[in-house]
Amino acid sequence: MSVAEFDADVIVDARDCIMGRVASQVAEQALDGETVAVVNAERAVITGREEQIVEKYEKRVDIGNDNGYFYPKRPDGIFKRTIRGMLPHKKQRGREAFESVRVYLGNPYDEDGEVLDGTSLDRLSNIKFVTLGEISETLGANKTW
């Protein structure tokens, strides 16, 4: 019996996959009416120089005030916010699609998730990347993964 309470049509494994590529395919599947669960979000990667990536996310977290824009620090929140950016989340269709997506740290399901085509880190010759878990630690998130 799986620990997850969300009954997903598709389980996607984000381990060693490029976050943006996974997020775009997950958003597309959600818009098509499928319920999607993304597992191992803390091990998804963003390509590029670590200093630039961390600086970009620190800037996003610092923007706003007590009432203003909130940007997540945890890996699952960052991943879900990325998916939201690829959906028309201000329209009914986009809201429904966004509600049909769950992002998890680790894998609460009994079966392993599938790796989506074209998302694996193996496709790049670039060896510069940083995982979402490392970004979250730098941003000051409590490490629970």
Swiss-Prot record:
* Keyword Thylakoid part of the UniProt annotation: no
Which parts of the chain span the membrane according to its record? none
Tell me which family the UniProt entry assigns to this protein: Belongs to the universal ribosomal protein uL13 family.
InterPro entries (UniProt xref): Ribosomal_uL13 (IPR005822), Ribosomal_uL13_bac-type (IPR005823), Ribosomal_uL13_CS (IPR023563), Ribosomal_uL13_euk/arc (IPR005755), Ribosomal_uL13_sf (IPR036899)
Give a Gene Ontology cellular component term annotated to this protein. cytosolic large ribosomal subunit
Free-text function comment from the UniProt entry? This protein is one of the early assembly proteins of the 50S ribosomal subunit. Binds to 23S rRNA.
List the residue ranges forming a coiled coil, or say none.
Answer: none
Name the PANTHER family for this protein.
LARGE RIBOSOMAL SUBUNIT PROTEIN UL13 (PTHR11545:SF3), RIBOSOMAL PROTEIN L13 (PTHR11545)
The protein's name is Large ribosomal subunit protein uL13
Q: Which organism is it from?
A: Haloarcula marismortui (strain ATCC 43049 / DSM 3752 / JCM 8966 / VKM B-1809)
SUPFAM superfamilies in the cross-refs? Ribosomal protein L13 (SSF52161)
